[in-house]
């Protein structure tokens, strides 16, 4: 049986010679075939292994392809399908019921437990323990002795889909309802459900810098866009960002007033100005990746995922020739670290003959730590470019599907005007570019000035002083 996925079509005549099939003539017609959902082909007439297929068009390669999904066999379209529909309906009802109960639970403790003004709650639904911006804030507060003033509370789960015990969930709700300051670092559905008292601070210590890809309400009309009347993100009272440009971008994305955004800097960028941290981290990274210490040049390939969200995230690995990249590394005495986005579940297939030159760095969570041993970054649409730019090192942009990405996700500003470089469209062009090694540092300097109000390593202190402590 075939698998669900994207299938590019090759056409040939009766003798086997390839045929060029003419696609849509106008850009409007091409765009219409990018995100279509109406099934246009049905594959298989047997009782098993039947599939729906949607005919689509690749804007970057001018090729037709089929978006194929498994379809239930005829024998299944009876009591099994009916049962599944009933189960799904019951699950939706239960979900609504749970949300209402959670809000009532929150409201009870919020009303009857007096706040003391000193309880700060760190939480996340994307990591199992404290990390990222939240950890930098907490650790710096400890260094400054603020644990004598504040009571620290914590609740972390690896993902929004992770099941947890009733006791753990009730503790989360209690902390949420009785804390004076709530700090989160990503999307967290349960945080958006209740209404908070006006004196409670809800701080979104967002994990990304800059104003790059469209998010939230900026994605209207694109796959995965939120509803206009959504409660998502609306509870935030304070959001630290890296620049005035980020203020405008995130205000539009979250549908919030610009006054809720503070261009004080992003805490996790402080490490790029801390010589002791850099020295310790480089030693740790070389122990984790010994091949990197021996190499003349260390490359990092860190692309973002494709798809709408974590559930359907993927990466088109066929666009990367790891055999050619391995040969390049061997010839140039280089090392390639590959760090896929955490949403991508498929592992990188490294050619065995180049296992000493290509390393899958997926097991190491904090990509910023890896950056200190990297000489050259290769990415596409990842926000990693902001942190890496602070090191003033070359970066290249392998954007093989730029038009498709713009059609389905898009950018806050035009892609070519955002990145400190030029898009690279083919893998062979990428290899040629890496061999040449040319890079315009003027682009990089302009990029840093545009996206960082401060480059002094004191962002965490500003977040603590201006947002948590409320100093002017």
Describe the residue ranges of each PLM region.
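C-terminal amphipathic helix plus adjacent low-complexity
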Residues: 107, 277, 426-472
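Extended catalytic core of nucleotide-activated donor transferases of GT-like folds
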Residues: 160-228
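A nucleotide-sugar donor-handling region in carbohydrate enzymes
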Residues: 96-106, 209-219, 226-310, 314, ...
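Conserved catalytic-core segment of nucleotide-activated headgroup transferases in glycan assembly
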Residues: 129-140, 253, 261, 267-350, ...
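Catalytic binding pocket for nucleotide-activated donors in carbohydrate/polymer assembly enzymes
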Residues: 350-354, 383-451
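A donor-sugar binding/catalytic signature common to diverse glycosyltransferases
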Residues: 182-211, 364-408
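Basic, ligand-binding patches in group-transfer machinery
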Residues: 1-118, 143
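Donor nucleotide-activated moiety binding/catalytic core segment of transferases
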Residues: 166-181, 189, 342-386
């Amino acid at each position: 049986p075939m698998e669900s996925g994207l299938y590019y079509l090759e056409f040939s005549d009766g003798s086997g010679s390839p045929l060029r099939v003419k696609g849509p003539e106008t850009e409007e017609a091409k765009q219409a075939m990018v995100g279509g959902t109406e099934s246009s082909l049905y594959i298989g007439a047997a009782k098993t292994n039947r599939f729906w297929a949607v005919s689509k068009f690749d804007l970057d390669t001018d090729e037709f392809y089929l978006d194929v999904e498994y379809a239930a066999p005829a024998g299944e379209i009876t009591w099994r399908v009916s049962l599944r529909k009933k189960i799904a309906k019951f699950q939706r009802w239960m979900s609504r019921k749970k949300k209402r109960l959670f809000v009532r639970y929150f409201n009870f403790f919020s009303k009857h437990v007096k706040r003391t003004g000193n309880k700060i709650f760190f939480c996340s639904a994307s990591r199992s323990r404290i990390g990222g911006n939240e950890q930098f804030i907490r650790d710096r507060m400890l260094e400054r002795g603020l644990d004598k003033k504040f009571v620290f509370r914590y609740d972390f789960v690896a993902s929004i889909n992770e099941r947890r015990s009733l006791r753990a969930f009730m503790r989360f709700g209690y902390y949420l309802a009785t804390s004076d300051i709530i700090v989160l670092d990503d999307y967290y559905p349960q945080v958006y459900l209740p209404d908070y008292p006006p004196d409670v601070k809800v701080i979104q210590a967002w994990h990304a810098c800059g104003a790059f890809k469209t998010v939230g309400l900026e994605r209207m009309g694109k796959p995965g866009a939120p509803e206009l009347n959504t409660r998502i993100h609306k509870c935030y009272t304070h959001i630290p960002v890296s620049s005035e440009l980020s203020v405008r971008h995130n205000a539009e994305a979250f549908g919030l007033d610009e006054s809720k955004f503070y261009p004080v800097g992003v805490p996790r960028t402080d490490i790029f100005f801390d010589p002791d941290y850099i020295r310790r981290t480089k030693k740790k990274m070389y122990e984790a990746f010994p091949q990197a210490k021996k190499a003349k040049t260390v490359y990092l390939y860190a692309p973002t995922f494709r798809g709408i969200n974590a559930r359907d995230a993927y990466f088109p690995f066929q666009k990367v020739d790891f055999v050619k990249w391995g040969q390049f590394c061997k010839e140039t005495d280089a090392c390639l670290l590959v760090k896929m986005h955490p949403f991508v579940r498929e592992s990188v297939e490294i050619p065995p003959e180049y296992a000493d030159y290509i390393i899958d760095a997926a097991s190491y969570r904090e990509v910023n730590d890896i950056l200190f041993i990297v000489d050259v970054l290769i990415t596409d649409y990842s926000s990693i470019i902001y942190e890496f730019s602070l090191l003033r090192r070359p970066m290249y942009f392998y954007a093989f599907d730029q038009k498709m990405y713009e059609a389905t996700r898009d950018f806050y500003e035009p892609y070519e005007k955002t990145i400190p470089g030029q898009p690279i469209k083919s893998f062979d062009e990428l290899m040629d570019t890496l061999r040449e090694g040319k890079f315009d540092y003027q682009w990089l300097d302009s990029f840093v000035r545009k996206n960082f109000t401060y480059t002094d390593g004191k962002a965490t202190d500003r977040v603590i002083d201006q947002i948590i402590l409320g100093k002017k």
